């Protein structure tokens, strides 16, 4: 049986963790290193650190904050935001990231994905796909959800796998921060189209949502932010719930 992972996400702006709804209306939640440490203690399997304003502001990821966060963790840390080159990937890995998430750059300069995968291994390369429902399908949006690439999300997932992505971080923009549940249809479509692990993101609001995205959509991991920041769900209790429901989790 596949062991499912619970991942806590830190959306970082100006060095502080924030959270909004559908990528808008951001509210301050705390310090990245402090929250990361707390989530590891609570039983998170991994931490994702996303510098959400780096690309839009045309700057690189805040390496100092990455180092601080990595220094308090013994679980894997994925870092994204503001990555434009293979050198940026290298800098993040040498400053404490275990994996690097590529989002906008993957769509605008796909060769970075394949080059990073060759140089550092697929296990270090995560491609983040921010998808929004358009018509009967889903389209890929970049630059913090502000730019429609015209790419079909499921087709794009297949392509990034071929380019060397070792994992896909799939976020439903429609569900982000709503706490209405993950987009099961979107997640299932990407899981079926690819062989690499898929992390479901966007919409977690209660334990049942995690169960559904694992059992019905087949996600390998489920990511959440706001419900953990606000104490709506404790990770340890969530894992107990999933285990009781027959889902294999690390305890």
UniProtKB/Swiss-Prot annotation:
GO cellular component: cytoplasm
Domain of life: Archaea
Pathway where this protein functions: Amino-acid biosynthesis; L-histidine biosynthesis; L-histidine from 5-phospho-alpha-D-ribose 1-diphosphate: step 5/9
Record carries keyword ATP-binding: no
Biological processes per GO annotation: L-histidine biosynthetic process
Keywords from the named record: Amino-acid biosynthesis, Cytoplasm, Histidine biosynthesis, Lyase
Catalytic activity: 5-[(5-phospho-1-deoxy-D-ribulos-1-ylimino)methylamino]-1-(5-phospho-beta-D-ribosyl)imidazole-4-carboxamide + L-glutamine = D-erythro-1-(imidazol-4-yl)glycerol 3-phosphate + 5-amino-1-(5-phospho-beta-D-ribosyl)imidazole-4-carboxamide + L-glutamate + H(+)
Transmembrane segments: none
Single Gene Ontology MF annotation: imidazoleglycerol-phosphate synthase activity
Family: Belongs to the HisA/HisF family.
PANTHER family: IMIDAZOLE GLYCEROL PHOSPHATE SYNTHASE HISHF (PTHR21235:SF2), IMIDAZOLE GLYCEROL PHOSPHATE SYNTHASE SUBUNIT HISF/H IGP SYNTHASE SUBUNIT HISF/H (PTHR21235)
Subunit-level organization: Heterodimer of HisH and HisF.
Protein name (record): Imidazole glycerol phosphate synthase subunit HisF
Organism: Metallosphaera sedula (strain ATCC 51363 / DSM 5348 / JCM 9185 / NBRC 15509 / TH2)
Gene that produces this protein: hisF
